[in-house]
Structures are given as structure tokens and as C-alpha cells.
Amino acid sequence: MEEINAMNYPKLEINLRKLEHNARLEVQKLAKYGVTVMGVNKVFNGLSETASAIIRAGIDVVAESRVSNLKKLQHLPCQKCLLRTPSPSEIEEVVRYTDISLNSEVAVIQSLSREAVKQKTIHQVLLMVDMGDIREGIWFENREYLEKAVKQTLELPNLELYGLGTNFGCYGSVNPTVENGRMFVRIARELEAKFGIRFKYISGGNGTSYHLIEKGTWPEGINHLRV
């Protein structure tokens, strides 16, 4: 009976050598365009072997959408990123087990600051802007709230502004284009001018943006992808 059940379960075979090779090619290719890669370790259920493979390939930030998975990677020599906005009940663990998180709510950013002060650590915020995909982020036309979120992240103690990010090709099937990429960069530049800062990273989405690189039309200013 056990053998029959085992045969019915799906099985995922992972070639770590090929994973490392492909990740290294990705890092090298995107580096030619001035783009840094955040390695997404989703699907593998927090498997440290796959995370280690992409770290060996040159990726220094590993991202997951579950805090429980990031707990499993604490021993690895990389920064850890929660690939979504934390829920209020997760704040303590997010600050303890992650270095970076995606954020779009001022109240959550304030909670992260309070907890980071309590834990005597620094937490980095990747502030998300919704450019029409309706997946996550502050709506790009809601400039007042966006500016408030930037201001809070800059002023609250024990927080650092990791960068400005957006999503394409997810929930709303809004594909990345030269036009919306440039619009996103323009928003980033306007925020930089207002606050007298320079975003370390302007994160332009995920693997759906690859076609712009293949076409040689990569929007100037986007220097980060979550892949």
C-alpha cells in the first residue's frame, strides 16, 4: 500500500549542477546591463541545497515568500528577503529571520521599525509601486501616499530603504514594456529629487522582463530583478 501511494506522489528531480550553471549565466548576462539579481528560491520549500547552488553562482540575496522557509536558510552566507508584505502577526519573525522585505503599507513599515529597534537590528525595505498589474504595491498615481511611505522609511529608526520595486506579468497580466519601464524609472527619479536621495536598487520585476534584454530595449535606470 505504501509503495502504491509513493508512486502516486509527484516527484521533482533537481540537477544542482545545472541550476548553478544557469544561475551563473543569468548573473553574468544581466551584469552586462548593470542589473543585480535577487535569487528567488520559491517552489523548493526552503531547500538549502538549491539556495546554496544559486549563492555559489554569485547571488547574494535569496528570496522566499514564506518566513518558515527563510528560517531554514539562516545558516547560509547571504541576505534573506521576504518576497511579499509582512502581515502584522509576522513582524517579530520577519525582523528576526529576514534582512529585507517588500512593503507597501505605512502601518507595516512603522511596525517593522518598532520591532527592529526592539531587536537592535536594521531591517531593509523594498518599497513596492503598482504600475497596473494589481498584484501588490502603492498605486503609481497615489503620489501622496507613496511619498509618505518613502518619508517614513527614511526617517524611522532602524530601517534602511533598500530600493523601489514593481511587478509585471503577475496577477493583472500587465507585461513589462519600454514605456511602463521608463514610467517607473521616472517615478523613482522624481522621488529621488524630492527627498535628495539615490535609490540603490530600482527593481523592475521578474523573469517576464527578459524579453526587453533580448530585444536590446532594456529601460535605462532599472538595475535589479527578482528571478
Predicted region positions:
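Active-site loop/helix belt of alpha/beta enzymes
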Residues: 131-227
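A generic, well-ordered mixed alpha/beta core segment in the N-terminal half of proteins
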Residues: 91, 96-135
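Alpha-helical structural signal in soluble globular domains
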Residues: 29, 53-57, 72-76, 93, ...
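A charged N-terminal "starter" segment
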Residues: 1-87, 93-98
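Active-site-adjacent beta->alpha loops and helix N-cap segments on the catalytic face
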Residues: 21, 70-76, 107-121, 173-183
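Non-membrane alpha-helical structural segments and their capping/turn regions in soluble enzymes
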Residues: 9, 13-20, 48, 92, ...
